[in-house]
Amino acid sequence: MLSFSRVVNCSRTCSRFLGLSLGTASLCAAGANIALLFPNWDVTYLMRGLIGKHAMLGSGLWGGGLMVLLAATLISMTGSFSKSAPCLQVLIALLSSGLALLGAVICFVTSGVALKDGPFCMFDVSSFNQTQAWKFGYPFKDLHNRNYLYDRSLWTSVCLEPSKAVVWHVAFFSILLCISLLQLLLVAIHLVNSILGLFCSFCEKH
């Protein structure tokens, strides 16, 4: 009886820690997505509508951010429902896990696609008469013979504006990718912790 009680208490403490960790990760994801809206901390690109679709989608704000933050709040409150019915505890665990899982997956997929397509920037488009023309777009999206992620020479030679567009894009979307992976790991731990805690609660009552 004592061992089951200790496991249950440990599970509740772990839930609070997981909730705090997920909440912190969600705020970091939101911060990274906000940074992507202001290349080089310049607001003019956002005002002119020259921000890439992946950053404008805001998956780090509402997916890895708000959805995970709501789930983290539910997870942290798990200890408050310690005397409630097991069915309610199961419902809260499933709801919080599903919400965090969905938000993290959305952020992960969007970040992966963004890294694959490359940054939205101004680049040189050579016409048939060899005159120079510039436009905003995704210069690396259809570059099949070279991968810009591994070819650092392309980082400074292709995108003309914003300056260091590739570095900014790769850095913050990589951060979002890592944060979403961490969130997925924390959700998996939360599921295991919830199942263990509920099992021990049943054993403790019987």
Curated annotation (Swiss-Prot):
Segments in the Cytoplasmic topological domain = 1-16, 76-89, 193-206
Q: Where in the cell is it found?
A: Lysosome membrane; Cytoplasm, Cytoskeleton; Cell projection, Filopodium
Outline the segment boundaries, as ranges, of region: Important for homodimerization. Answer: 182-192
Residues carrying a glycan: N129
GO MF annotation list: protein homodimerization activity
Please list the tissues where expression of this protein has been recorded. Answer: Predominantly expressed in osteoclasts (at protein level). Also expressed in white adipose tissue, as well as in bone marrow-derived macrophages.
What's a single GO CC term here?
A: lysosomal membrane
Transmembrane segment boundaries: 17-37, 55-75, 90-110, 172-192
Q: What induces it?
A: Up-regulated in gonadal white adipose tissue after high-fat diet. Up-regulated by oxidized LDL in RAW 264.7 cells, a macrophage cell line (at protein level).
Q: Which UniProt keywords apply?
A: Cell projection, Cytoplasm, Cytoskeleton, Glycoprotein, Lysosome, Membrane, Transmembrane, Transmembrane helix
What kind of membrane protein is this, topologically?
Multi-pass membrane protein
Q: Which residues lie on this side of the membrane: Extracellular?
A: 38-54, 111-171
| Chief site of localization | membrane
Q: Which GO terms describe its biological process?
A: positive regulation of osteoclast differentiation
Instruction: Name the source's superkingdom.
Output: Eukaryota
Q: What happens when the gene is disrupted?
A: Knockout mice are born at the Mendelian rate and show no overt phenotype. Animals exhibit higher bone mass compared to that of wild-type animals of the same age, because of impaired osteoclast differentiation (multinucleation). When fed a normal chow diet, knockout mice show normal body weight, fat tissue mass, adipocyte size, or body composition. The knockout does not affect energy expenditure, food intake, physical activity, nor fecal lipid excretion. When fed on high fat-diet, knockout animals show reduced weight gain compared to wild-type littermates.
Q: What does this protein do?
A: Negatively regulates vacuolar (H+)-ATPase (V-ATPase) activity by interacting with members of V-ATPase V0 complex and hence inhibiting V1-V0 assembly. Required for multinucleation during osteoclast differentiation.
Family, similarity comment: Belongs to the L6 tetraspanin family.
Share what the entry says about its subunit structure, partners included.
May form homodimers and homooligomers. Interacts with integrins ITGAV and ITGB3. Interacts with components of members of the V0 complex of vacuolar(H+)-ATPase (V-ATPase), including ATP6V0B and ATP6V0D2; this interaction inhibits V1-V0 complex assembly.
Q: What name is this protein filed under?
A: Transmembrane 4 L6 family member 19
Please tell me the species this chain comes from. Answer: Mus musculus
Supply the source organism's classification.
Answer: Eukaryota, Metazoa, Chordata, Craniata, Vertebrata
In the UniProt record, the gene name given for this protein reads: Tm4sf19
